[in-house]
């Protein structure tokens, strides 16, 4: 059903291209995963261009659990251990310990403070000592190989940033309805139309990456 509902937005390749263009312009994208998986849509921004207004939108329109997707090597460089030793979550979402910037924040909860924390974490040469633990930003470790390894929003986010030529770090949060329930694809499409945000799927990113590999081959 996802593909049929998204058909008005073009092919899978065209939807990804629209998303990449939005990210390059400092705007957000909406990414929906497989119907037989979480069947949820995440609002995603590039970490390097994230603004306070965009963070406020994530907090206001989404679940409130704002996550910072990072590649494995960045997680290791920041010495961020897993949140739990044995991850028993349904889809193995790789949360690390939560973080806070050590400098430039007050309580760490405000939109501005969360942006400060994210900028501190993704800075070139960022050190473990730049971050306090725990905090109000939740890093997620992406699997090497991206969506071709794991079809999750974390990997999709990193893939999109790399395909857009941006730093491999993105911020996401699950879109919710006004009544607090999770937004599904019809609501995600309506939300995208309301805010002029392109919509694509994890499957689209898989197809896009496979097409690139086929062209190289």
Curated annotation (Swiss-Prot):
Highest taxon in the source lineage: Bacteria
EC number(s) for this protein?
A: 4.1.99.12
State one Pfam family annotation: DHBP_synthase
Can the keyword Thylakoid be found in this entry's annotation? no
Give the catalysed reaction(s), semicolon-separated: D-ribulose 5-phosphate = (2S)-2-hydroxy-3-oxobutyl phosphate + formate + H(+)
Q: Which residues bind D-ribulose 5-phosphate?
A: 37-38, 42, 150-154, 174
Q: What is an annotated GO biological process for this record, any one?
A: riboflavin biosynthetic process
Q: Which InterPro entries match?
A: DHBP_synth_RibB-like_a/b_dom, DHBP_synthase_RibB
Per UniProt, the enzyme's principal EC class comes to lyase
Which cofactors are reported in the record for this sequence? Mg(2+); Mn(2+)
According to the record, cofactor stoichiometry and binding are noted as: Binds 2 divalent metal cations per subunit. Magnesium or manganese.
Q: Summarize where Mg(2+) 2 binds, as residue positions.
A: 38, 153
Note the SUPFAM superfamilies from the entry.
Answer: YrdC/RibB
> Pathway membership of this protein?
Cofactor biosynthesis; riboflavin biosynthesis; 2-hydroxy-3-oxobutyl phosphate from D-ribulose 5-phosphate: step 1/1
- Keywords for this protein: Lyase, Magnesium, Manganese, Metal-binding, Riboflavin biosynthesis
Q: Where exactly is the site Essential for catalytic activity?
A: 136, 174
Q: Which Gene Ontology CC terms are recorded?
A: cytosol
Q: Does the keyword Hydrolase apply?
A: no
Which of this chain's residues are annotated to bind Mg(2+) 1? Answer: 38
The similarity annotation says: Belongs to the DHBP synthase family.
Q: How does it assemble?
A: Homodimer.
* PANTHER family on file: 3,4-DIHYDROXY-2-BUTANONE 4-PHOSPHATE SYNTHASE (PTHR21327:SF38), GTP CYCLOHYDROLASE II-RELATED (PTHR21327)
Question: What does this chain do?
Answer: Catalyzes the conversion of D-ribulose 5-phosphate to formate and 3,4-dihydroxy-2-butanone 4-phosphate.
Q: Could you tell me what this protein is called? A: 3,4-dihydroxy-2-butanone 4-phosphate synthase
């Amino acid at each position: 059903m996802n593909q049929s509902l998204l058909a008005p937005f073009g092919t899978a390749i065209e939807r990804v291209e629209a998303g990449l263009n939005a990210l390059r312009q400092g705007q957000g994208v909406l990414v929906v995963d497989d119907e037989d998986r979480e069947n949820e849509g995440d609002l995603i921004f590039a970490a390097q261009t994230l603004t306070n207004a965009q963070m406020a939108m994530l907090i206001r329109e989404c679940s409130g659990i704002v996550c910072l997707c990072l590649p494995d090597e960045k997680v290791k460089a920041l010495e961020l251990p897993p949140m739990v030793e044995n991850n028993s979550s349904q889809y193995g979402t790789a949360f690390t310990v939560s973080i806070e910037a050590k400098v430039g924040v007050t309580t760490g909860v405000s939109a501005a403070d969360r942006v400060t924390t994210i900028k501190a974490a993704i800075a070139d040469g960022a050190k473990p000592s730049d971050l306090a633990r725990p905090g109000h930003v939740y890093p997620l470790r992406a699997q090497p190989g991206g969506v071709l390894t794991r079809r999750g929003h974390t990997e999709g986010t990193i893939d999109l940033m790399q395909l857009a030529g941006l730093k491999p770090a993105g911020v996401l949060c699950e879109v919710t309805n006004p009544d607090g329930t999770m937004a599904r694809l019809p609501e995600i499409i309506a939300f995208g139309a309301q805010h002029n945000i392109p919509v694509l799927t994890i499957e689209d990113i898989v197809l896009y990456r496979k097409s690139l590999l086929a062209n190289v081959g």
